[in-house]
C-alpha cells in the first residue's frame, strides 16, 4: 500500500473517531499529533477582573466626605443644584411607580439574604475542613466589598448633604440667643394656633383628633405642601413623589421611629400606626430629607413651614403641635412654672391629643426603644450633629428666629 495513502486514511479515521475533540495535525514524517491547548496562558487572558476594585470605594467615600466637611460650598452645590438633585429625582420617580415602600421590601430581602448567606457560610466552614481559611477569607472579602458599595451609595445619597450650608443661612434667618420672655411668647403663640386649628377637626370615638382622609390623599397633600415651598425657598426643589406607608409600622413604633428617609431608594417612609395628629408633620419631615436637608432640626422646621403653608387644617394643626412640643420642652427646661402655665391654657381637645400621644409611646418603653435611641444618637453624632438626639431641640432657635423676622416691620 502506498505510504502516503495509508497516512491519509489513518488521518481521516482518527478525525472521525475524535470528532469534537482537540484538532489534529500531521507532524514530522507523517506522524499524527494531537494539538494540546496550553491552559495556563489562556486562562490568564480570559480571566475577568475580580471584585477587589470595589474596595476603592472606601477611600472614594472618605474623600468625598472630607471634601464636603472642609468646603460647605461644595456640599451646598452638590445638594441644591448639582448631582444630588438629578440622582434623587431619577431614582425617586422610579420607586414612586409602586404604591408600596420599595425600601421596606429591600430591607426584608436584605435580612433574608443575610440569614441565607450566613447559614451557607457556616455549612461551608463545617464541610471544608482543609480550606476553612480560604473560605473565611473569601466570605469576609465579599462582605467588605458589599459594605464599600453601600457606604459609597450612602455618601452620594445623603452623606455629603449633612455638610451643606445651614438652612438659616440659606433662607436668611438670623439665629441668636433668645430670652426666656421670647421663648414664652413663642409657646403661647403656638398654643393659640394649635387651639384654633383643633376646633374644626374630626375626632374619633375617644374625642381624639383623626385625619378623616386615607393615606394616599394625605400623602398627596404633603407632597403639594412641600412643592409649594419652592416659591419662597427655591433651594427646596419640587418634582418628588409622595411619601410611602410602612407595612410593619408597629415594628417602627417599638424602635421609637415615626418615619424614615431611605437613601438607597430615595423614598420618604412613614409610620402609620402613630397618633393621627403627628402623621402630616412626619410626612413633611421625611420629604424634607428627600430634598437634601438631612439635619433633623432643619427637617422639623421645614416640616412646620410646609404644614403652616398647607391649605389643610389637619396639616396646620400637626405642624403647630410639632413646633409646640419642642418649644414647650425648651421652656420647661428654662422655667417649669412658665411651661406649666402655658400647658394649662391649652384647649381640652389639644390636651387630650397630647395625652393620647404620651399614652401611645409609653407602651413601647423598654430595651428595644432604648437601643434604637442609642443607635440613632450615634448615627447623628457620626454625621456632625454633635448634640446627638438632643439636637432635635435646636429647632426652637429657628422658630424664634422666624418669630423675630415676622414681627420686624
State where each predicted segment sits:
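Post-HExxH zinc-binding segment in Zn-dependent metallohydrolases
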Residues: 294-339
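Short, positively charged and aromatic/hydrophobic N-terminal segments
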Residues: 5-8, 17, 25-34
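Transmembrane alpha-helices and immediately adjacent membrane-cytoplasm interface residues
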Residues: 115-116, 134-168
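Membrane-embedded alpha-helical segments of integral membrane proteins
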Residues: 61-124
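Auxiliary, metal-adjacent structural segments of Zn-dependent hydrolase domains
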Residues: 202-272, 276
Amino acid at each position: 500500500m502506498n505510504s502516503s495513502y495509508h497516512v491519509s486514511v489513518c488521518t481521516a479515521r482518527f478525525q472521525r473517531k475524535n470528532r469534537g475533540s482537540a484538532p489534529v495535525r500531521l507532524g514530522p514524517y507523517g506522524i499524527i499529533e494531537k494539538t494540546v491547548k496550553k491552559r495556563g496562558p489562556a486562562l490568564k487572558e480570559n480571566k475577568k477582573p475580580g471584585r477587589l476594585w470595589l474596595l476603592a470605594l472606601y477611600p472614594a467615600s472618605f474623600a468625598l466626605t472630607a471634601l464636603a466637611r472642609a468646603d460647605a460650598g461644595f456640599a451646598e452645590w452638590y445638594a441644591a443644584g448639582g448631582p444630588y438633585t438629578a440622582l434623587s429625582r431619577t431614582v425617586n420617580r422610579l420607586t414612586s411607580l409602586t404604591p408600596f415602600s420599595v425600601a421596606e421590601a429591600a430591607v426584608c430581602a436584605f435580612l433574608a439574604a443575610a440569614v441565607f448567606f450566613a447559614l451557607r457560610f457556616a455549612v461551608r466552614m463545617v464541610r471544608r475542613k482543609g480550606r476553612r481559611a480560604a473560605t473565611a477569607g473569601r466570605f469576609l472579602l465579599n462582605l467588605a466589598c458589599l459594605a464599600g458599595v453601600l457606604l459609597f451609595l450612602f455618601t452620594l445619597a445623603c452623606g455629603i448633604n449633612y455638610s451643606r450650608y445651614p438652612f438659616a443661612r440659606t433662607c436668611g434667618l438670623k439665629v441668636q440667643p433668645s430670652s426666656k420672655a421670647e421663648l414664652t411668647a413663642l409657646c403661647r403663640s403656638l398654643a393659640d394656633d394649635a387651639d384654633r386649628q383643633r376646633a374644626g377637626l374630626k375626632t374619633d370615638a375617644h374625642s381624639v383628633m383623626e385625619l378623616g382622609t386615607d393615606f394616599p390623599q394625605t400623602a398627596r397633600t404633603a407632597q403639594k405642601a412641600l412643592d409649594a415651598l419652592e416659591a419662597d425657598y427655591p433651594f427646596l426643589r419640587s418634582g418628588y413623589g409622595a411619601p410611602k406607608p410602612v407595612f410593619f409600622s408597629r415594628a417602627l413604633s417599638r424602635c421609637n421611629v415615626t418615619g424614615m428617609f431611605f437613601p438607597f431608594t430615595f423614598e420618604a417612609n412613614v409610620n402609620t400606626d402613630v397618633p393621627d395628629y403627628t402623621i402630616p408633620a412626619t410626612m413633611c419631615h421625611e420629604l424634607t430629607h428627600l430634598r437634601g436637608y438631612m439635619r433633623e432640626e432643619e427637617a422639623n422646621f421645614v416640616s412646620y413651614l410646609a404644614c403652616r403653608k398647607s391649605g389643610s387644617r389637619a396639616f396646620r394643626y400637626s405642624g403647630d403641635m410639632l413646633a409646640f412640643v419642642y418649644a414647650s420642652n425648651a421652656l420647661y427646661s428654662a422655667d417649669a412654672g412658665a411651661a406649666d402655665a402655658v400647658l394649662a391654657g391649652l384647649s381640652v381637645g389639644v390636651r387630650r391629643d397630647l395625652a393620647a400621644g404620651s399614652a401611645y409611646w409609653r407602651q413601647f418603653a423598654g430595651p428595644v426603644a432604648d437601643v434604637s435611641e442609642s443607635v440613632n444618637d450615634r448615627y447623628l453624632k457620626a454625621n456632625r450633629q454633635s448634640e446627638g438626639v438632643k439636637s432635635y431641640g435646636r429647632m426652637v432657635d429657628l422658630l424664634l428666629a422666624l418669630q423675630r423676622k415676622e414681627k420686624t416691620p
